From Swiss-Prot:
Domain of life: Bacteria
Necessary cofactors: Zn(2+)
Gene: nrdR
Cofactor note: Binds 1 zinc ion.
Name assigned to this protein: Transcriptional repressor NrdR
């Protein structure tokens, strides 16, 4: 590890500890030549995910692009920045869990929408309007109707599951 100040290659580790919920190791080092201290992080290097764009072009997954899009969608809502970061972390973790190293931009968009939906309706519709390229008010109305219908369906499913669980308990 080269010293960032004098480029000397020999240093000693003063302290090591887990960081980022155990996802990395933080090391405090001291250069043996200039005696200045610096911090390094060790992280697991994942095989990069390749995104297949709508035009067929391929590029490396860029977390900052997704984060920027979600932050814009969540602007002036009550969604805290930490929750946005967690949403993008969850998406990235889900992509890393896949056996395929390629994903379409459409799949990423749908994943973001699925994560935004329970989080904030306004952010969901804003993201959908850009991702699905809304051309006018009719597109917004259509998306809102679909959103409401799905919300009612989700509510009905939850009630049915609770009834089934109650029935199973009473049958025992």
């Amino acid at each position: 590890m080269l010293c960032p100040f004098c480029s000397y290659s020999d240093n000693r580790v003063l302290e090591s500890r887990l960081a980022e919920e155990g996802e990395s190791v933080r090391r405090r080092r001291e250069c043996k030549q200039c005696r200045r201290r610096f911090t390094t992080y060790e992280r697991i290097e994942f095989v990069p995910t390749v995104v297949i764009k709508r035009n067929g072009r391929r590029e490396a997954f860029d977390r900052s692009k997704v984060l920027r899009g979600v932050m814009i969608a969540c602007e002036k809502t009550d969604v805290p920045a930490e929750l946005i970061e967690q949403l993008v972390d969850d998406l990235q973790a889900e992509l890393q869990q896949r056996s395929s190293r390629e994903v379409t931009s459409a799949e990423i968009g749908e994943m973001v929408l699925a994560l935004l939906k329970p989080l904030n309706e306004v952010a969901y519709v804003r993201f959908a309007s850009v991702y699905r390229k809304f051309k006018g008010v009719a597109d917004f109305v259509s998306e809102l109707q679909t959103f409401e219908a799905n919300a009612e369906l989700d509510s009905l499913k939850a009630r049915l599951e609770r009834l089934a669980a109650a029935h199973d308990q009473s049958a025992d």
